[in-house]
Amino acid sequence: MSNPAWQTVDNTNLFLKVAIRNWGLKQVNEPHILDCFCGYQELRKACYSDLPYFGIDKKSDTPADIHCDNMEYLRTADLTRYNFIDIDVYGNPWEQFLMVSKRKHGKFVCVLTECIEFNVNTNSISIGMKGILGIPRKMKIPCLGRHIEFMRSVMVKYADEKFGSKYITGIRSSAGNANYFAGVFEKTN
C-alpha cells in the first residue's frame, strides 16, 4: 500500500537520492559530510560509509552524532571542515541552505531534498521564503507549486547576492512529491 502524498516516509526514491549524492561527491576533493537530517543514517550507509561524516538529528532515538536543532548547529558550529552539506528534509530546505550559504566559505556541495510542492500548493510556505520571493505575507497564489523551479532559482540567486555563495553547477531530479537538487557553490569573501 502506498502512503498518501502528505505522509512522510524516510528515504522514498532511495535510488535517486543516492544518484544525486554520488554526483555531488565527485565534485569535491576529500568530501567531509555534514548531514543535517541524518535520521537512521540510511544515506550514510548507501553513500558515505567510508567518508568523514557528522550527523545531526532532533530525534533522540536516532544514531546521530548530535541530537539538536540543526539550525542552531548551523548558526553556531564551525563549518570549516565540511565541504558536502546534506539537507534531506521533509519540507522546505531553504532556511538551512541560506544559513550554510551565509557561514560557509570555499567550495562546497549542497544536496537538498525539497518536499515543498504540497505546502506551496496550499500556500503554506514560510513567511521568510515569501519575503525573498516578493510575495506579500497574506497573499495566496493558486497553483504556486507549478513554479518550484523558478522559486529554487530565486533562492540560489538570493544566496549569491546576499552572501556571495556563487552557484557553479548542479543537477536535479524529481519523483512523486519530492525534488532533489545538488549544487556546487563557491564563496571566496
For each feature predicted by the language model, list its residue ranges.
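S-adenosyl-L-methionine
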Residues: 1-50, 58-84, 179-181
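Structural motif
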Residues: 32, 83-84, 109
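Conserved beta-strand positions in the Rossmann-like core of class I SAM-dependent methyltransferases
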Residues: 54
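Short, charged, surface-exposed secondary-structure boundary motifs
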Residues: 63-66, 119-124
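A short, conserved alpha-helix within the catalytic core of class I
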Residues: 91-104
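Conserved beta-strand signature within the Rossmann-like core of class I S-adenosyl-L-methionine
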Residues: 107-121
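A conserved mid-domain beta-alpha-beta active-site/ligand-binding segment of alpha/beta enzyme cores
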Residues: 128-186
